[in-house]
Amino acid sequence: MSKRDYYEVLGVAKNASDEEIKKAYRKLAMKHHPDRNPGDHAAEDKFKEAKQAYEILSDSDKRAAYDQFGHAGVDPQSGMGGGGFGGGGFSDAFSDIFGDIFGGGGGNRRDRVYRGADLRYNLEIGLEEAARGTETKIRIPTLEECGTCHGSGAKPGTQPTTCSACGGHGQVRVQQGFFSVQQTCPRCGGTGKMVSDPCPSCHGEGRVKKHKTLSVKIPAGVDSGDRIRLAGEGEAGVNGGPSGDLYVVIHLKDHPVFKRDGDDLHCEMPISFATAALGGEVEIPTLDGHAKIKIPAETQSGKVFRLRGKGIKGVRSHAPGDLLCHMLVETPVNLSERQRELLREFEALSPGRNNNPRAQSFMDKVKSFFGT
């Protein structure tokens, strides 16, 4: 089967400019691309035909051979020196076309820049620091731009060279069936540059390992898991790319008195059994000092007293939480003989379980369970 004239395939005149040829090919490629015409074999054939025509007409040497000898001039089997289909013309157009369609566009030759990696630092602080806010200094390991080569990776007085494998694109095309796929260049690692004479300070990396000290402001009300972002304090970028960010993650230390629950605080308050039975006034700790609360008579262990506004005002809260005090009635120890005697007397004056409502309730449940 004879091949159609390549100018006819693209719908351009024989004296068409390179831009006209490229424009015509872009239009046909987008119209007949197999991804846009799944299962349409006719469209696939037209796509291949347009691709072949552009491969020849976009290359000045191949176009000249085609204009002089026709298809025989570019057929590798004819022996007339056309060179076959290896060139970069199609690759560039393919990249431009599908960069337009899918938002990519890897056809330029700008040095590839990469943003530096983000860093994480776990910071332990006390409950009081979290409640009131504080400022502290941290020391972190990171990668900074090399001061000797200023990030180029090349020895001073020399310059990186363009990677010959990818032509400075940082990516290469690998043919897979009828399609070509872009991949990171294995030779330059995607930078598009090669360093033949590396910098002695960074050994060609363009970045060096260092420790730096930063001051971090901790806002009042932070809690475990909260993150503080320090923009641009992460690792340095590559080829002049922007630095990453540093995320300081807050972790609260255990407190000897309080436990935090959101904006509320909890604490246990031991009281004597005499105070629990007769009532009284006790002094309890808060983050702002001490406060006094009245304990009513017959207070049971586990009773909770709420002090409103004595908790923590969270970062995103409009008002502070509460302090919840859990009463813990203590059993006396190290009793003297006189104290033991008085307790025995008290027990003797307590007929049945009337003075112990919980015990009475428990015994009633036991009797009900056994049916007695």
From Swiss-Prot:
The gene is dnaJ. One of its GO terms (cellular component) is cytoplasm. Its main location: cytoplasm. This is Chaperone protein DnaJ. Its cofactor is Zn(2+). CXXCXGXG motif repeats lie at residues 146-153, 163-170, 185-192, 199-206. The lineage of its organism: Bacteria, Pseudomonadati, Pseudomonadota, Betaproteobacteria, Nitrosomonadales. A zinc finger (CR-type) spans 133-211. It is found in: Cytoplasm. It comes from Thiobacillus denitrificans (strain ATCC 25259 / T1).
